[in-house]
Amino acid sequence: MTQHSPAFVTPDWLEREQLTDTPTPVFFGWLFNQQSLTRRLDRLSDGGFDIVPLSEGWQALRDDECAALGLPAASEGWVREVYLRGNGENWVFARSVAARDALQHGGLHMDELGTRSLGALLFSDPAFDRGTLQVCHYPQSWLPDADAVSGLWARRSQFSRGALSVLVAEVFLPALWNAIHNKDHA
């Protein structure tokens, strides 16, 4: 489970039009691509893609997550944190959350995913609508210790189906950018 730092100010999640600190064109293309990240990573890794679960369970959601899901502060939800890996390297840290009430009545069993991709599940169900992508520099204190680096770009979006909403945040780790660079220059 990632660290909680109550003294840390919640980052500003910004939509494309609100960005003043614009990432490079390659970063921008990955951050705002609407396709399944799982599929893109699988292609980039030439089939060497896998998921490593880090933690999952019921816990109090972060303030920014509650606000995005329209919940009261400190609402409880299911939190799933995983690495999306390519060829044995951690490429993306992902944190997915859903409110307890919505999840228990929404027919999505996040607790049964194991090493399966939540993204693949969400993109295979046409009833899920994806909200607007937002980006930020993800707080270092919210990352697993092994990848706790400041200034990493992250994106998040909300997937909704009826009363069920799942907020998915994806932090792009340095090894991913290295893999993209190496593939572009191969």
From Swiss-Prot:
Compartmental location: Cytoplasm
Binding annotation for substrate: 80, 118, 170
Major localisation: cytoplasm
A GO MF term: chorismate lyase activity
A biological-process GO annotation: pyruvate biosynthetic process
Enzyme class, broadest EC rank: lyase
InterPro entries from the UniProt entry: Chorismate--pyruvate_lyase, Chorismate_lyase_/UTRA_dom_sf
Coiled-coil segments on the chain, per record: none
E.C. number: 4.1.3.40
Purpose of the protein: Removes the pyruvyl group from chorismate, with concomitant aromatization of the ring, to provide 4-hydroxybenzoate (4HB) for the ubiquinone pathway.
UniProt-recorded name of the protein: Probable chorismate pyruvate-lyase
